[in-house]
Amino acid sequence: MALLGAQMVITLIMVSVFQKLGSFFSLARWLLCSTGLVRYLYPTDSELRQLAGIPKVTKEKSKGKKGSKLENGDVFRIPRSLDVPLESTKVSPLDVVHLRFYSEYQWVVDFALYAGFVFLMSEVYHGFYPIKDEVNLSTVWCMLVLGFATKVLVSLTVQYFKGEQSVGERSTVIVAAFAYLLIAMMVMVVDERNLESGLETAYQSFNTSAARFLGSQGLQSSGPASKLVLKFFLALWCGFIGGIFIFPGFRAARMHYDLLKYYEVNRIKRFLLNVSFASPFLLVLLWVKPVCRDYLTARIFSGMTAPLMTDGAFDSMRLVAVIVVALHRLFLMPIYLQAYLNMAYQRVQEQRKEAGRITNRELQEKIASVFFYLCVVTLQYVIPIFCCLFFAFLFKVLGGFTWSGVSVPFESPALLYSSPTATDDATTIMQSARQFTLALDSLKQVFTIEVSRGVLGFALWWSTFAWFSSSFLGILYQTYFQHS
C-alpha cells in the first residue's frame, strides 16, 4: 500500500476481481435473465397450418407443381385476422448469448459496475485521507466508461445509415443533430445569471492560466483560442450528443407509453411512472439559477434568519439528485424491458384488425425480431443513464465538491520547470518521474478547478437535457402522431 499508493491498490484489486469474477457473475446477464423477464415464442409452421386449416403439402404434390412457391414446403399464407396464441417463456442465459450486441452490452454494463465500485471505494478512502498532489484514478475509470458507452451508442446509430430501408431513421438522426446544435448555440448566449453553464468563468480561467503557462515557457501569447471558436466546438459536441440520444429517447418513450397503457387502471403506479419519467426535467431545472439556487440559497423565508441552503450544500444536493435519479431509472429497467418484450404480443393483436393475408415467415420474423433486438434496446436505455451518472462522478471529483456541502480550499500547484541535468542510467527513471510530475502539475495549472466545473457541469447538464428532451419528443410522437 505504501509503495503503490491506495488508489493503485484499489485499481489492481478491481481489475483482478473483474478478471476472475467476470466469467461467474455478470450484472448484465443477471439483469436480463434473473429479473423475471418473459419473452414470447413465435408459432411453428405446423401450428400455423393447424390454426389456418391449411393441409400439409406432401413432397409428391409439391414436385408436381413446377415453379410453385410451395416447392420447399416452407412458405404459405394465412389470414392476418387469424387468432394466433403465443407461448411465453422466461429469458435464459442460453437465449441472450446469441443476441445482437450482447457482448457490447455485457462489457459496458459490467465495466460500469466495477468503475462505480472503484469510485465508491476511492471516495470512502479519500474521506479519511484527503488526496494531495495525486491523480484520482477513479476519474480514469469514469472516462473509460464514458468512452466505451459513447462508442457503443455511435455504433448503434451508424446502423441507421446502413441499408436502403433506413431513410427515415437516417433523416431523423441528422435533423435531430442540427436541431440540438441550434439549441446549444442559443443556450450558450444565455446569461449565467439565468443558467449556470459556468462556461464564461471556465473560459476566463483557462485563458488566463494558459497565457501564464505559455509565458513561463518563453512564449508570448494572449490566449490559446477565442471564445467563439471554443463555444462552436462545444456546440458541435452538443449536436453530436443530441443526434445519438434521439433514438434512445424515442425507445424509452415507447416503453413508457406502453407501461402507462398496461397500468391504466392503477393510477398510483401511473403517477409514480410519470414522476420517474419527468425526473430528468427536474434535474435540468437545478441549473436554472432563478428557479433553484436563488430560491434555496439567497431567499430568506419568513420566520427564518438564513437561507435554506448554502452554496456548497446546494451543489452537493444537485450531485446527489443526479445520482439518485440515475440509479432509480436503472432500478426500473426490468419493467421497461418487459414492456418492450410485450410488443410481440401487441403486434399480433394489432395484426388481427388488419385485412389481407401474411406469410408464415413474415409473422414469425415479426414476433422473433422483438427478442432479437433486446440487447440493442437495453443499450439504448442504459447508455444515456450511464453518461449522466459518470459525468456527475467526474463533476464531483474534478470540480472539487464534497458530499457534506462544506467547501474545501483548492490549492493549485505552482508552475515549475526544470531541465534534466544528470545523464547516467541510474537517474533516468527519477528524471522521467520528475518530468511526468511536472507535466501533471502544468496540466493542473492550466485546467484549473474552475475549468473543470464549467466544462463538466455543462456536459452533465446537457446530457441530462438531451436525455429528457429526446424522451419528451418521443412521448409527443407516440401520443399525437403514431396513434392519431
Regions found by a protein language model. Give the residues of each.
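Charge-rich, low-complexity intrinsically disordered and helical linker regions
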Residues: 49-87
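Alpha-helical transmembrane segments of secretory-pathway, organelle, and plasma-membrane proteins
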Residues: 1-46, 79-484
